[in-house]
C-alpha cells in the first residue's frame, strides 16, 4: 500500500573522470553507518564514508547519551557496540575522571551513560584507526545504475564509485535513489497479522476542547479523524531532538528565547494543564558531568516531539529537510519557553525547567543545540525479508542471522486528534512491549535477508538501518545499539562481496558467519531471561535492630506492569521497580507484615529522588481497624547520608496483620518502589495493670 520507488534521478551516463574510488562506500554516518564502515575496513576493504551533514555519528554522538541498551540483552550486544562502549569508559579513565559505567557489567537496567563529546571523540578515533576516509557535507544528488548494480554516486562533493554500497542513512536515501522498493508509514493489522499494527490509543483522552472559537483544530493537533482502527496509513512516529542540558552554573549556556514566539501555539497544552492533564513536559536522564539527556516522553501528552512534523521528511530534498529541521528546532525552543514562562504551568514546574540550560562544552558548532534530529523511523526496505511482530515475539530464530536485537517494541505518537464530540487523543504510541516479569525486550535474530534488496532491483547494495521491516518491527529495531550490530554485519558482508566480486545476495552465509564471529559479533540467541514473578509476602520480613523492619520490593505483592531496574544507586537489596510513568492506576504494591512490640514506628521510604518522579504517591497503612493515609513527593531528596526518608510515625501493635499499599493512581511522573523501613522509636506502651 505504501510502496514507492524513485526519488532521485537514475543516471545512465558514465561518471566523470576523477571519481573517487573505493571497494566499499557507505552513505550515512549514523551508528549503523559508521559501524558498517569500520567493520568493512577491518576486513581489509578500502572504505569511504559519506555523510550528508556536517555531523558524524547520528544520535549516538548527537544527544542520545542515555544508552537504550539498559532494556536490551546486553550479553548479545558484542562486537563494535561493546568495543565502542569500552573505549568510552577508557576515555574517562585516561582523563582521571569517574567512570560512568562498567561495560563488563551487562546487567539489564544499569545505566550506560556518557557525554556527547566523548562519544564523538571515540567514534572519530575508531574511524581513523580503521583507515576509513570520511567525507562530510556530502549530499547525494543522483545514482548511476549499470543494469542491476550501482555504478557510482554523484554528490555535492563530487563523484564516487565502489564495488559494493551500504545505505547507512536513517531515511534510506541511497536505496530510494537506486530504484529499490521501499515502504513508508504503518501497515494494517491484516497485512502481516500484527496485533500491534493499525491505530493505537494507549494514552487517556484529554478532556479538553480541541477546537478554537472558529471551529478550527487547535495548533499542535494533526487532524479530526485518525482513520479506521484496523487500517494502516502513511504516518510515521514523531521526531524530536535529544537535548543535552545542565543546571551547573559553571557549564550552563542560557537557552535562547525563540524568535517570533506565539503563545497561542500552546493553547492545547494550556487547556490540558487547566484540566489537570498529566504528562506536559519531557523526560530527563542524568549524565556524567552534571548533565541531563532530555527526551520526548513516550507516556507524555505534549512533549518534545513535533507530532505530525515527521511525515514528509523522507521525501524532502536537502533544502526542504533543512526547513523541516529548523521547524523542529523552533518548536523545541518554543516548548521550552512555554514550560519556563507560561502562567498555566505550575510555579514549581516552571522553576525546574527555568533552571536548565544548554552545555557550554557540547555542540559548540551549532550554538550548543543538538546537531542531529532524532529520525526514529523513515523509509523501510521492501526486499528479500520483512521482519514483523511475529519474528520478534513468536519466531525469533533465523537461518542466516547477522545480529541479535532485543529492544522492546516501542513507538512514539503518530497523530494528535481533536474529537468532534469533545476531547483530544494522541494516537500511535506502542508502550514498551517487554518479556513479562523482566525489564527487557524479546531477543530475536536479524537475518541477512532483511538488509538485502531483491536481486532484480540491485545486486550490490546493503541496507542495515532502513532495513526490511514493518512499522511494528521497526519500533524495536530503531535503537542505536541494534543498528550498530546490524551495521557491523552489513560492513563485513560488503567487504566480502567486494573482494570476491559477488552480488550481495550470492554471498555464502557460512563465509559471512565465520567473519562475523571473528569480529566478535554475537549471532546466537541468548537463553530466555529470568522472569521476576510477583513475589509472595514474606511471613516475617527481614528485621534488624535498631533498624527495625525492612520491607524490600522483593517481598511485595505486585500487580500491574512494574519494571525492575538498577539504574539509580544506591538502592536497597538487588534493585527496585518503577511504573514507567504509566499513571494508569494499574501498578499496585502490597506489603504484609507484623510488628514484634507495640510502639510508635517511624516509617521511612527508600527511593532515588529525581525531577522526573511523582510528587504525590498515595500510601496507605491499614490494620486492626485503623487506617493511615499519606502522600510522598519523590522529587524530594533523602536526608544527607541516609538510606530512608522519614514519612511519619504510626502506632502499631503486635498480633495485628498490617498491610502497606501504594499505587500509581493519580500520579504524575515515575513511581519508584525500592523499600520501606519501620523503625521503633522506643515509645512502648505501658504494661496493663
Regions found by a protein language model. Name each.
Residues 33:
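N-terminal Rossmann-fold NAD(P) dinucleotide-binding loop
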Residues 539-689:
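Extracytoplasmic
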Residues 45-46, 51-142, 146, 183, ...:
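Conserved N-terminal/central alpha/beta ligand/cofactor-binding core
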Residues 5-14:
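Bacterial N-terminal signal peptides
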Residues 144-159:
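Conserved beta-strand-loop-beta-strand element in the redox core of flavoprotein oxidoreductases
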Residues 120, 158, 162-164, 168-539:
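Flavin (FAD/FMN)-binding glycine-rich loop and adjacent Rossmann-like elements that form
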Residues 15-19:
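Sec/Tat signal peptide C-region and signal peptidase I cleavage site
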Residues 20-30:
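Beta1/beta-strand and adjacent pyrophosphate-binding region of the FAD-binding site
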Amino acid at each position: 500500500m505504501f510502496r514507492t520507488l524513485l526519488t532521485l534521478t537514475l543516471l545512465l551516463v558514465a561518471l566523470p573522470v576523477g571519481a573517487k574510488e573505493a571497494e566499499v562506500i557507505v552513505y550515512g554516518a549514523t551508528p549503523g553507518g559508521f559501524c558498517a564502515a569500520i567493520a568493512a575496513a577491518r576486513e581489509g576493504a578500502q572504505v569511504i564514508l559519506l555523510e550528508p551533514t556536517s555531523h558524524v555519528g547520528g544520535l549516538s554522538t548527537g544527544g542520545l547519551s542515555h544508552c537504550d541498551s539498559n532494556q536490551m540483552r546486553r550479553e548479545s550486544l558484542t562486537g563494535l557496540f561493546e568495543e565502542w562502549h569500552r573505549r568510552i569508559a577508557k576515555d574517562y579513565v585516561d582523563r582521571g575522571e569517574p567512570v560512568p559505567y562498567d561495560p563488563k557489567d551487562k546487567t539489564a537496567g544499569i545505566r550506560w551513560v556518557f557525554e556527547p563529546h566523548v562519544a564523538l571523540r571515540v567514534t572519530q578515533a575508531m574511524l581513523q584507526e580503521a583507515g576509513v576516509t570520511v567525507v562530510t557535507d556530502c549530499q547525494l544528488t543522483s545514482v548511476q545504475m549499470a543494469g542491476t548494480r550501482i555504478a557510482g554516486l554523484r554528490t555535492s562533493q563530487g563523484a564516487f564509485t565502489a564495488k559494493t554500497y551500504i545505505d547507512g542513512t536513517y531515511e534510506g536515501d541511497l536505496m530510494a535513489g537506486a530504484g529499490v522498493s521501499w515502504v513508508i508509514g504503518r501497515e494494517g493489522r491484516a497485512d502481516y497479522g500484527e496485533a500491534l499494527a493499525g491505530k493505537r490509543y494507549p494514552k487517556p483522552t484529554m478532556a479538553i476542547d480541541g477546537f478554537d472559537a472558529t471551529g478550527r483544530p487547535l495548533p499542535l493537533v494533526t487532524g479530526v479523524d485518525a482513520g479506521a482502527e484496523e487500517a494502516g496509513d502513511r504516518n510515521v512516529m514523531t521526531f524530536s531532538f535529544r537535548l543535552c542540558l545542565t543546571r551547573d552554573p559553571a557549564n550552563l549556556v542560557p537557552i535562547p528565547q525563540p524568535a517570533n514566539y506565539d503563545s497561542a501555539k500552546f493553547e492545547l497544552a494550556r487547556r490540558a494543564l487547566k484540566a489537570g492533564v498529566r504528562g506536559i513536559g519531557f523526560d530527563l536522564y542524568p549524565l556524567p558531568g552534571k548533565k541531563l539527556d532530555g527526551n520526548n516522553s513516550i507516556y507524555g501528552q505534549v512533549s518534545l516531539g513535533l507530532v505530525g512534523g515527521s511525515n514528509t521528511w523522507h521525501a524532502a530534498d536537502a533544502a526542504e529537510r533543512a526547513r523541516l529541521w529548523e521547524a523542529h528546532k523552533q518548536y523545541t525552543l518554543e516548548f521550552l519557553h512555554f514550560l519556563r514562562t507560561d502562567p498555566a504551568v505550575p510555579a514549581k514546574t516552571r522553576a525546574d525547567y527555568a533552571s536548565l540550560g544548554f552545555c557550554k562544552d557540547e555542540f559548540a558548532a551549532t550554538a550548543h543545540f543538538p546537531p542531529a534530529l532524532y529520525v526514529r523511523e523513515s523509509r523501510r526496505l521492501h526486499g528479500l525479508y520483512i521482519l514483523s511482530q511475529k519474528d520478534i515475539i513468536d519466531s525469533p530464530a533465523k537461518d542466516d542471522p547477522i545480529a541479535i536485537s532485543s529492544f522492546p517494541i516501542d513507538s512514539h505518537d503518530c497523530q494528535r486528534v481533536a474529537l468532534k464530540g469533545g476531547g483530544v487523543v494522541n494516537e500511535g504510541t506502542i508502550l514498551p512491549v517487554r518479556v513479562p516479569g523482566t525489564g527487557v525486550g524479546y531477543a530475536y535474530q536479524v537475518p541477512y535477508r532483511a538488509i538485502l534488496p531483491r536481486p532484480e532491483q540491485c545486486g550490490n547494495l546493503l541496507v542495515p538501518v532502513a532495513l526490511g521491516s514493518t512499522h511494528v518491527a521497526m519500533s524495536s529495531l530503531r535503537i542505536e545499539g541494534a543498528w550498530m550490530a546490524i551495521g557491523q554485519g552489513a560492513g563485513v558482508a560488503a567487504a566480502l562481496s567486494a573482494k570476491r566480486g559477488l552480488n550481495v545476495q550470492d554471498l555464502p552465509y557460512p563465509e559471512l558467519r565465520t567473519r562475523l564471529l571473528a569480529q566478535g559479533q554475537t549471532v546466537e540467541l541468548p537463553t530466555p531471561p529470568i522472569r521476576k514473578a510477583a513475589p509472595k509476602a514474606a511471613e516475617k520480613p527481614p528485621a534488624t535492630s535498631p533498624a527495625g523492619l525492612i520491607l524490600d520490593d522483593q517481598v511485595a505483592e505486585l500487580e500491574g506492569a512494574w519494571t525492575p531496574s538498577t539504574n539509580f544507586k544506591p538502592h536497597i537489596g538487588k534493585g527496585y521497580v518503577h511504573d514507567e510513568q504509566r499513571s494508569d492506576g494499574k501498578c499496585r504494591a502490597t506489603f504484609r507484615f507484623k510488628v514484634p512490640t507495640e510502639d510508635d514506628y517511624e516509617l521511612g521510604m527508600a527511593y532515588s529522588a529525581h525531577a522526573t518522579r511523582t510528587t504525590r504517591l498515595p500510601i496507605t497503612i491499614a490494620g486492626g481497624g485503623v487506617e493511615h493515609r499519606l502522600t510522598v513527593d519523590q522529587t524530594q531528596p533523602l536526608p544527607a547520608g541516609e538510606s530512608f526518608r522519614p514519612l511519619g510515625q504510626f502506632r502499631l501493635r503486635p498480633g495485628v496483620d498490617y498491610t502497606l499499599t501504594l499505587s500509581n493512581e493519580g500520579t504524575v511522573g515515575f513511581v519508584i518502589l525500592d523499600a520501606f523501613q519501620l523503625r521503633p522509636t522506643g515509645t512502648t506502651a505501658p504494661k496493663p495493670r
